[in-house]
Amino acid sequence: MKQLAIIIFLITSLYSHEANCLNMFAMIFDKNTTDENAAKCIEYYIDELGCDVNIVPSFANDGSNLLDAAYENNKTKTFDLLLNKDITPGKWLTAIIATEFLVFFRENSDGIKDKKASPELLEFIKTHKYKEFKEEKFKLIKKLLDHGQNPYHYGYLRVILKIVGDEKDLDRLLEQYKKDNK
């Protein structure tokens, strides 16, 4: 009977620990929690409670993680903290970045229709506004690659950029990464 009680205690302790660790997602998604406070709390959960920075909740069928949540909620300090805690950037984040390009194109031109760039979009990609946006996103991509993201996952973004005839910079960035990490 004593052994059964110990086993039950251990199982409930493990479940309780994982449930506590999932609170890190709540801190990121909570609009009332500042980025600074979210970063401090998450650091506590990782360093003091031993939570796994690469935790993926069972309800996240797509495999999204804390890094994806921090990025989508514009919590930059939390995002940087997670990278410094050796989180593994996943493929979901590359899809988010690729989608941001599509949304940006749509907000500033007619966008892409039927796998073709509109004439307005082809003119837009020559503007300073687009070049600034692309530079910001490419800095992020480089940062993610430097933290272990698989360059293969940028295939979707490459397809989007190829449609507008602007895939060469991404190709160079990915090739340079592959060369530097052989």
List each language-model region with its residue ranges.
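Leucine-rich solenoid repeat scaffolds
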Residues: 142-179
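Ankyrin-repeat boundary/"N-cap" motif
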Residues: 19-32, 54-69, 88-107, 112-128, ...
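Alpha-helix capping and inter-helical loop/turn segments
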Residues: 73-74, 87-88, 165
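Ankyrin repeat structural motif
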Residues: 35-47, 74-84, 104-111, 133-145, ...
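Classical Sec-dependent N-terminal signal peptides that target proteins to the secretory pathway
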Residues: 1-18
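Ankyrin-repeat C-terminal turn/loop position
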Residues: 50-51, 86-88, 149
